[in-house]
């Protein structure tokens, strides 16, 4: 499977989850440096926004757009996942007044990108995650999955929100 980065093909590996699948299990590092897993979000809908780094324009914009769109939804968690250290993600949220977001890093578990089918195998971003959004209902069943074809493009916000 491939995506593009600045119109250059980049191979990705792993199995990208599809609508109707169960959300794969995961263990990530939270902002407080403690582990986060599927169990922490039981009974909640999850919008999992996966991206290369919070310090890129498209990644930061997508976090802000999704946070604003989901602000009043008490039944939904916005889980932002990247290789960034928790300190960088916390700094971003403080500097940009981003709240109601759960930041998670896969820096301790690089296998996360394989398990979720977003592992960038080559190019300048090798080892980071491709841009993707996966939405799961309160039972852990995927209701939306989007692997963004061009890493520098934003996800389809309307389809994300319609899947909730």
UniProtKB/Swiss-Prot annotation:
Reaction(s) the record says it catalyses: a hydroperoxide + [thioredoxin]-dithiol = an alcohol + [thioredoxin]-disulfide + H2O
EC class of the enzyme, as a word: oxidoreductase
Annotated gene: tpx
GO MF, one example: thioredoxin peroxidase activity
UniProt-annotated catalytic positions: 59 (cysteine sulfenic acid (-soh) intermediate)
Name of the protein: Thiol peroxidase
Post-translational modification summary for this protein: Contains two disulfide bonds.
Family statement: Belongs to the peroxiredoxin family. Tpx subfamily.
Superkingdom of origin: Bacteria
Keywords: Antioxidant, Disulfide bond, Oxidoreductase, Peroxidase, Redox-active center
Extra remark: The active site is a conserved redox-active cysteine residue, the peroxidatic cysteine (C(P)), which makes the nucleophilic attack on the peroxide substrate. The peroxide oxidizes the C(P)-SH to cysteine sulfenic acid (C(P)-SOH), which then reacts with another cysteine residue, the resolving cysteine (C(R)), to form a disulfide bridge. The disulfide is subsequently reduced by an appropriate electron donor to complete the catalytic cycle. In this atypical 2-Cys peroxiredoxin, C(R) is present in the same subunit to form an intramolecular disulfide.
InterPro entries named among the record's database cross-references: Redoxin, Thioredoxin-like_sf, Thioredoxin_domain, TPX, Tpx_CS, Tpx_Peroxidase_subfamily
Residue intervals of the Thioredoxin domain: 17-164
The protein's assembly and partners: Homodimer.
Pfam families the UniProt entry points to: Redoxin
Function comment: Thiol-specific peroxidase that catalyzes the reduction of hydrogen peroxide and organic hydroperoxides to water and alcohols, respectively. Plays a role in cell protection against oxidative stress by detoxifying peroxides.
């Amino acid at each position: 499977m491939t995506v593009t980065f600045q119109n250059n093909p980049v191979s990705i590996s792993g199995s990208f989850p599809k609508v109707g699948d169960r959300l794969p299990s995961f263990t990530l590092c939270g902002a407080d440096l403690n582990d986060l897993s599927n169990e922490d979000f039981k009974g909640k809908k999850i919008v999992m926004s996966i991206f290369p780094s919070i310090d890129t324009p498209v990644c930061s914009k997508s976090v802000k757009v999704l946070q604003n769109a989901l602000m009043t939804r008490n039944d939904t968690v916005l889980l932002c996942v990247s290789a960034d250290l928790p300190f960088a993600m916390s700094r971003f949220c403080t500097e940009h007044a981003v709240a109601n977001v759960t930041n998670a890093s896969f820096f301790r578990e690089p296998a996360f990108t394989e398990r979720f089918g977003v592992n960038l195998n080559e190019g300048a971003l090798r080892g980071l995650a491709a841009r993707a959004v996966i939405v799961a209902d309160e039972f852990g069943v995927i209701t939306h999955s989007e692997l963004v074809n061009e890493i520098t493009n934003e996800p389809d916000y309307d389809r994300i929100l319609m899947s909730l």
